[in-house]
């Protein structure tokens, strides 16, 4: 009897040791294939690292780009996912901005804060080996239970006590993207702003454009379901379809086109639509990530004197975005239409990738 009890105790202890060491992680296997596999839990490598226990994550369209082979830098074998919030479990000796137990957002962009580009505010071009989009692309990301965050002093922001995980979930990527895009578009109060695309990033961009209080906002979206979502939640926004967009924008703007165009759709024909809908001397901000190369037909657009702006999400704004959420000025919780446990992430991806069941954003809990 004692031997049997000892054997059971040994097995239990062994199992506990095993589960303390391993975790489930959704992993990029090869082009076209992700899989949920067991991996060792991460440990600190550099003194600037932090270990975060993921409490909620999400699926981004960029994850689909990795799956389809459209992100050459993506490394097979990495855990995917770069949209997450969590609790700090452990910090390196040089991490001073956060402490164990803090609830934090995780920035999609990691940056050193010291190189030429960081010092000049272009943190998405950070030259550190872990700089730029590393998490869930070049190093293990957050569609898992624990994640190692390099350069944690810059990459983590403490979530205010009054802000929930759901409210903060999109801060580190799509909301920061929309905030950056609206900022660099130089929106004035007399402007007509056209946003092409009403997916998750498009709606986050819309929310951030609304902070600038332009005279008129037009959203162009092909999906009737998503147009209905925008109409229900943001009734002052004008809506159109890609087929009717050019004529609609001309009819609803003062100078023959939109003053500011933000291209967030990333479809085959939306880049051309963006500059065609812009008035002369307008700013066109390209937010989208494309699967295919785009053509810049300079002879066709020469006389329009357009300014194009593009680039990666700016990781400097997350603290300000959290403050705006705390103040009730930004609310992305209506975008979270579906919730799945990590064990059902394959189903979550199926629904998100195929745009089923009215999905906007999926939370992995």
Q: PLM features: what roles do these ranges have?
A:
Residues 97-100, 189, 280:
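Short, flexible surface segments
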Residues 185, 227-307:
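Glycine-rich cofactor phosphate-binding loops and adjacent beta1-alpha1 units
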Residues 101, 190, 235-236, 257-258, ...:
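Local beta-strand N-terminus motif with an aromatic residue
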Residues 18-23, 222, 247, 272-276, ...:
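C-terminal hydrophobic helical "lid"/dimerization subdomain
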Residues 42-57, 70-119, 160-163:
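Glycine-rich beta-strand-centered segment in the early N-terminal region that forms part
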Residues 60, 108-157, 161:
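Cysteine-cluster motifs in flexible loop/terminal segments that predominantly coordinate metals
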